[in-house]
Amino acid sequence: MLKESTKQIIRDSLGPLKQPVKIVLFTSDTGCDICPDAILTARAMKAASAKIALETYDIAMDRDKSDEYGVKRVPTFAVQAQDGRMIKFSGTLEGVSLLLLLDTVHSIAGVRPWFPEKILSTLKMLSQKIPVQVLLENDCTLCKPVAETAVGLALTNKHVSTEVIVADDYPELLSTLKVKILPFTVFGKQLTLEGHVSESSFLEMLFKADRQKAAGLDVRCVVCGQPSPELVCTSCKTKIQAEAVEHKRKDEKLSDRGSAMGSHNHG
């Protein structure tokens, strides 16, 4: 049964939605104890806004659709924009994962996530689609920024494909990947990072997965093009992180200012 508090969070978030967004839910009638709650969550989203177009499929019975969306586990929510951009969320939607999905809906419907220009321009050099998986816990606030970066990069570049996975719901996956620390991020098929991942580290791991940089002579930074033993040189990493931190500080100031004005107006 879906908690009333969860329904309220969904209503408050999706009620003001102004642009259409498609949510595709994949479930299974067998072997999925959490799928009924996923269906209730999806219905609550549909009820919260007429702008939500909801489609539901069975991962086995609708194999053509699950193949089309690249779905490998249930339940999985695919949040899709009209231009084809898509983010997947697998597992029980509550806490951190629910907030991430709701934020993703708004990003797809309106303003895209902000990233330093050096990251956006460098991402254009990716030659193939790189799948990114972020494993997290719903009560892990430290997991949220990592997942936000992965989601944001996928929304800003067609060569990045992101899936957010609630780790506790898939013990076999945890065992296969030998996960010990969350968040746990997988780039491509084999590259992994534990814990916090900065924007510049994300960029570096994406290009490692892309295999654009071969070992040997004349290895250069993918951002500035200068000779460097790493895919992103130390100088560019510092500049990217400084720009990202400054942007976050400005956002926090604007948020604090808005809260103060709201308190004054209602006082």
What are these regions (language model features)?
Residues A50-D64, K158-E172:
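Thiol-based oxidoreductase modules, predominantly thioredoxin-like and allied folds used
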Residues C140, D218-C224, C233-C236:
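Short cysteine-rich clusters marking metal-coordination/redox-active sites
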Residues A78-P113, I181, V186-A215:
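Non-catalytic, surface beta->alpha helical segment in thiol-disulfide oxidoreductase systems
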Residues P227-P229, Q241:
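Short functional micro-motifs and their immediate structural scaffolds
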Residues T6, I10-S49, L123-K158:
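Local sequence-structure signature of Cys/Sec-based thiol-disulfide redox active-site neighborhoods
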Residues M1-K22, V96-Q128:
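N-terminal leader/targeting and pre-domain segments
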Residues S235-K248:
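Short Cys/His-rich micro-motifs in 6-15 aa windows
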Residues S66-R73, L173-L182, L191-V197:
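Thiol/disulfide oxidoreductase modules built on the thioredoxin-like
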